Every structure is written in C-alpha cells, then in structure tokens.
Amino acid sequence: TDVTYKILQDIDDWQNRPLDEIYPIMFIDAVHFSVREDNRIKKLAAYVILAITLDGRKDVISLQIGENESSKYWLGVLNELKNRGVKDVMIICADGLTGIKEAIGTAFPDTEYQRCIVHQVRNTLKYVPYKDMKAFAADLKTIYLAPSEEQGRAQLERVTEKWEPKYPNAMKSWIQNWDVISPIFKFSNDVRKVIYTTNAIESLNSTYKKLNRQ
C-alpha cells in the first residue's frame, strides 16, 4: 500500500541520513526478540548503535537486524557509518560481540574499544547466588572505580583471591578480557561515568522490547 511504501521510504531515509564527522562515544548493544515466520518462532537480534554527540546529545544512528555476528559483519556496519560521514570515534563501548574488536581495529584504528562494564558485571554475577550477590557486586565496583589501572589490577587480584575458592568461574572473564576492560582508566571521571552507566541505551532497548511484545 501507499502507507507501507511511505513508511519503508522513511526508514530507508533514516538509515542512510548523513552523520556527524566526530563522535566522542558510541554504544553498540543487542536487543533479542522473537518473530513468527512460516508458523515458527524465530529468534533475532537488533543491534542498536547509540552515539553521544560533541554537544552531549544522544542520537540513535543505526538499527540493524542481524543473524550472524562476525568481524566481517561488523566491518560492514562500521564502514556504512564511514560512508555516511563518520571520520572519527574516540570510544566504542560494546559487550563481547563476536568479531567487534577486530572490526573496530580495521575500520577505526585510532578508536578505543571498551568492554561494557555493566554487561561484564551482570555476566559475572550469574555465577553468584543471591546471598553473596550484594557483597560480590560491591567488590567488583572497587575494580572499575579504581583511580588507575595499576590500582584496578590490584583490586582485581584481591577480589579474585577472595572469591575464587568459592566461585571459581566468576572472575575468569575479568582476567581474560582485562585488555578490553582496562581502557576505562585512561579517561576522565565524567567519561568513565558515561561508560559504566548504560541507562541511555538500556532504556531505549526496553522500549523496543515493549513494542515487540505488542
């Protein structure tokens, strides 16, 4: 219908609109949802890219439906942003999406890749029962709120030594992913607060989930 065509045209215009040349921070996150296709329920992921502009505004600049994460997939997404005018991004903050680190290194070699701290904490607490969750979360906070990487690393060793005998798998990802967790210590306190609080993109994702349920 004409209405459908108009909506699809508007979506296409939005997905291809020109972007700013420079963004201080971009967040990439996935919203998982279910769709019915051929009388079957299919799981899909919508990848949302939320950018913080130079004047502090939040702007959703891309929404992609993806099935197969890979460095090739993410390189295509990032190159699309470049084709729309993006020349430089200071920090890209994302969870451990398959291939994202390699793609960022190719498309934006000067950009700092930062593992999402909120996701990192949540994934860790999955290994911890409710009775210890509050104390464990407080200990994790001493790592990412430390004033320097050296002190953060010392706290990482302390927390691991304290909890590893009880929950041997909980801290493994912090040790294995320290190279992409630790960039946060390079930034000012204001930038760090933006990175370890994902309210902006999480509220957006909860809205998408509500719309999907309708």
Residue ranges and their predicted role:
Residues 145-214:
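Acidic/histidine-rich catalytic cores and adjacent linkers
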Residues 129-130, 188:
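Generic structural signal for alpha-helix starts
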Residues 83, 106, 130, 206, ...:
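Short, well-ordered loop/turn and helix-capping segments at boundaries between secondary-structure elements
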Residues 2-93, 98, 102, 107-110, ...:
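RNase H-like nuclease fold core
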Residues 131-148:
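A polyampholytic, Gly/Pro-enriched intrinsically disordered region
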Residues 109-126:
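Inter-helix linker motif
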